Every structure is written in C-alpha cells, then in structure tokens.
Amino acid sequence: GLHKIIGFARRTQGLIVAKGNPLGLQSLTDVARTGARFANRPLGSGTRVLLEDLLAQEGLTGQHIAGFERDETSHTAVAQAVVSGAADTGLGIEMVARARGLDFVPLVDERYHLACLKATLEQPATRALRELLLTRVWQDHLASLPGYSPMHSGQVLAMSNVLPWWDFTRPKRPSAHRKKP
C-alpha cells in the first residue's frame, strides 16, 4: 500500500492512586461505587477520550464519577492532585504516578505507531529514525520507563495487521475508453 506503519512503543494507562491504594480501587466501577474524587483530563484530550470509552465499557457515564468535571492539564497535574489530597484518583500514566511516589492500577495498554508514506521508508531521515528505534540502547531506555515498553520499535508493519478495520481498497473507476453497451 501507499502508507506504512513503523512500530514505536506500548504505554500503560490506569488509575493513579495514593500510596497503598487506601480506597482499594481496581476499576472505574470501584471509583463510581466508592465516590472517590476524580481528577479528569480536558475534553478532547486523548486520555479523556480513553476514559469515556472505558466508562462506556463498564456501563458508566461521567455522571457516575465524583469530580468528573474537574479538569487537569496533564498527567503530571492529575498525579499532583492525588498527592495534594485534592483528588483520590485520576486516569494517567504509570511513569508520573511512580515519580510522585504514588501507586498505579493498570487499566489499558496503548499501542503507539508512526505512519509514513511507503516512498519515505528509505529516505535518510526515516531510515535513521528506524535504525535508532531498533537499537538496544533505545529499547532498554524505553523499557526502563515505568509503564512503557518497546513494541515492534523500528519495524515496518503491515497496516492491515495494525489497523484490521481499515479498508484500503478503492472502487475501480470505469475506463474512459470503454465502449458503452
């Protein structure tokens, strides 16, 4: 096909909670059931979209979550809200939870890929990036970050494997030189 996918990384998102997880939160259903105060991300952010999808999967809406309307600007700000006691939990990444001495309850793994035109795969910049992503140094560094891991880093992947729902076929146009019946 015209486009190619390059593997990059895997990242885990979950509930950022106080050390020891005093409310025993293991799911968004637990957050709703306990009335835990939630630090949210802004409407339109990737984490907010993910949260709304996860809530729907559990048969919940934002109305079930105390503090759903409280927006924080970043994963770090969510963690800080938990540290300060302004919130009991929020959805975010493990790395910021660990950096603030908090605990983390994993909920979902996200896959990150880079997309490019097939024609750019052998251009010097793309080749250099792919070579870097394939190095043990890069993969070890990524694996050293809490909640991150290499996932096919630097490998060219078939779009049909990464995005099985995508239909890359286009209907054929009638040829202009064909005779009409």
Model-predicted regions and their roles:
Residues 10-12, 102-131, 152-158:
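Periplasmic-binding protein-like
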Residues 29-49:
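Short loop->beta-strand "edge-of-pocket" segments that line small-molecule binding or catalytic clefts
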